[in-house]
Amino acid sequence: MTDRTSTIPTERDALDAYSTTVTSVAERVLPSVASLRVGRAGRGGAGSAVVITLDGFLVTSAHVVAQGGSASASFLDGTEYDVDVVGADPLSDLAVARARGATIEPVRIGNAEQLRVGQLVVAVGNPLGFSGSVTSGVVSGLGRSLATADGNGHRRFIEDVIQTDAALNPGNSGGALADWQARLIGVNTAVAGMGLGLAVPMNRTTEAILSALMRNGRVRRAYLGIAGGTRALPPAVAQRLGQKAGVEVQEVVTGSPAASAALRGGDIIVSVADVAVAKAGDLQRLMVEAHIGTKLALSVLRGDHLVTLDVVPVELP
């Protein structure tokens, strides 16, 4: 008689498959992850960094390199390199550094926009000084927002942040969050609580930020000069426009482009250059370098009327 149970995967088989996947990811990602030390011993920052180009460019977290000064990167094979910080962008908590003379195999870059909740992820970094550490978990949530700020008092929300239960600890910042195919889909940035870690996603927006940092050492953003938040649209307007919400202007900075365009408190911005905006993050994503000094048409709900205002953003100071 045939033992039919032999064809049914056992719990051990499932665990072996899980372990095989995590092991495979670790073997492919670990050689590209560095332990990063910045500044003077005992006074600087420490974290992780990930090689993203064959000629030694690394991505890390902006807060890891915020102390400035000299930096070094050490890898699992024992090699160590002096590192130059090329540029940092506190408003995205991303930074780019370059290991002098390094020719290390980079990680493959993935696309966080393709992630699904429940998907396996592997975190690789150097928590608490323990180099080459690997933890695994799942994508616990998508579309989270993480508040950031720079030294000039500007605040911004990093959109589409990845939430994971893969264990993250101090020192993991700047390390890799990889998918099951060993592709970099996030840069670990924050420990929000027990079993709750956050990573900046790798997507079109962050790749543009990294390219700007590699090219210019900084990120240029357009600036309107408003504070605002999401506001539901009246049903009739929502039906007419095909969107449920817009960005209500709560404050207009004196002397700003928004003030020059005659935006008022209480106005609800529903589109910019014919692109619908339903929340602050939508508006924020449109404030790119290409729009600095360019006239943009704002469609605004003012009372019961839709009006069009022209605004010319300046560079975020």
Model-inferred region functions:
Residues 2-245, 254, 288, 304, ...:
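Serine-dependent protease modules
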Residues 111, 198, 251, 270, ...:
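A structural signal for short, well-ordered beta-strand elements
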Residues 211-218, 260-264, 270-276, 282-317:
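PDZ-domain C-terminal substructure recognizer with occasional recognition of PDZ-binding tails
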Residues 246-255, 273:
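Acidic- and glycine-rich mobile interface elements
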Residues 255, 266-267:
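Structured functional modules or segments
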